[in-house]
Amino acid sequence: LILRRKSTLAVRFNFTGTVMFPKKDAKRPFVKEMEKNGRKMLSMNFGIKESDNNMAFVEAFDGEQETIKSKNADNENIEIKWKDRFDDDVVSSVASYRKTTIDLGEEFDGRHEFVTLYDAIKYLQENLPKYNGKVTVTGQMVKEPYNGKYYDKFKIQSVYAVADDKKNRLLITADIYYNKDSVDKTDWKTEKKIVVDGYIQQYINKDEGNKFIPQQFVFNASKYDENNEKHKKLLDYKMKYIDISKKTMQHLLWECVMLNGAETVEFDESQLTKAQKEQIELGIRTLNDFRPAGSIFGDRVTEYRLFDPKLTGDFADGIVDADMSASEFEDEIYVMASDENMDDVMKKAEKKDEPKVEEEETKTDSEPEVDEDDLF
């Protein structure tokens, strides 16, 4: 089978917010030190809080090694001796996508580049608790199988300080594959919500290569004002990329906003009891008389909400046909064993065989227009 699509676009994340450290006695603490086969290992885990009710955790894991296997700027295999990993010439020779970059500002001596996550973790362990302010963390989102389910992991590649007035946001950028049958409009009339049961591509291991993995996305138009002309134009614009008519698989690069918590909801009569509604009908009370103090939150959810198509590169003209028949696409969907976990997958994988994945960098110096900023 010869597939006619270009190299895989990694699913990238760009999270901006406040750092939240796990409790010291947490099952997954900020940093956990361990030893395996005589090698020191480190794992890191901390949250990026977008708001009081929306937060995502990012992570890193690495260990000491005699020889570091990496890639140079030409994507060629290189080997680095452990003792040489801080050498400036060595660091500069490594491809940017194989390095971890940290910049917590001039107070922390600016930009630092590491050829191992192990050293990046140690640096963050010492310095991140001393830092006050917002950060942006970027990296790759990976779906890891465990006992028949996928769990989303956000692997750190860079951490840097940002201005306090930068808008908090949990953003991912994904090349999403979908067709007409992927789009579920069941709740459109009642909730202004569309569910897209699409797919993303991910490198599995050297035996499997790149495979398609199911991923659900949501388009929520409940905040669009039908009386606002710009909102109407924006809605029509986005719908032409969502409510597609083709049966063959299409794909498009989307910016998505991650919601991992409870969303604030507007207070209205639907939240009143029958007795309270009767008082309003009789003019005894008004809706404001029953309005609770503070914000009202809905159910806790984890959703990736379609925000804006990224019309760059191969997608400059919009959505692209995947150029695959239905059977070809089905053959490329990854099927995991019900009892499989990531350790099973990684046993087959070797870093030196892992291909370079294209990275669609998320611009951090521009934000969507204010009128559109919260339409997701």
Model-derived features: positions:
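OB-fold and OB-like single-stranded nucleic-acid-recognition modules
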Residues: 2-376
